[in-house]
């Protein structure tokens, strides 16, 4: 009788661009302005199971540039990966989904965002490297604080 293989499995099935948009709502007038725009970048990570042992990790970015209160351009992007993760201890799953997987997907997102901005006629916006471990630990700490601050109901 063959034994079931219980070796840990962690591998990439696919990395893909899930969504990408570039908006220039105030063009062409805003392009004549010589001021340097302000840049705001927001990032997010989402993980969800898609099948037994398969997880989709999506890293999202929004890059919003403004001159005064007028938008120069806004990019919204979602880069995703499908990962096979099996036979991993449950206490290690959060770190894999929140740190290891986003670290693999993020460089693809950075490249796609820089490319679409340049194709839109703008100088590239280079998104910095992200410490996903620090981001994950901060989210975990915030979740712990939220549960500890929840009102206690005594029965």
Swiss-Prot record:
Keyword vocabulary terms for this entry: Chaperone, Cytoplasm, Protein transport, Translocation, Transport
PANTHER family attached to this UniProt entry: PROTEIN-EXPORT PROTEIN SECB (PTHR36918:SF1), PTHR36918
HAMAP family: SecB
Assembly and oligomerization: Homotetramer, a dimer of dimers. One homotetramer interacts with 1 SecA dimer.
Keyword Transferase assigned: no
Main location per the UniProt record: cytoplasm
Signal peptide (residue range): none
Name this protein carries in UniProt: Protein-export protein SecB 1
UniProt GO BP: protein folding; protein tetramerization; protein transport
SUPFAM superfamilies (alphabetical): SecB-like (SSF54611)
Disulfide bonding pattern of the chain: none
InterPro entries: SecB, SecB-like_sf
Similarity comment: family membership: Belongs to the SecB family.
Subcellular location as annotated: Cytoplasm
GO cellular component, one term: cytoplasm
Entry superkingdom: Bacteria
Gene Ontology MF terms: unfolded protein binding
Annotated function: One of the proteins required for the normal export of preproteins out of the cell cytoplasm. It is a molecular chaperone that binds to a subset of precursor proteins, maintaining them in a translocation-competent state. It also specifically binds to its receptor SecA.
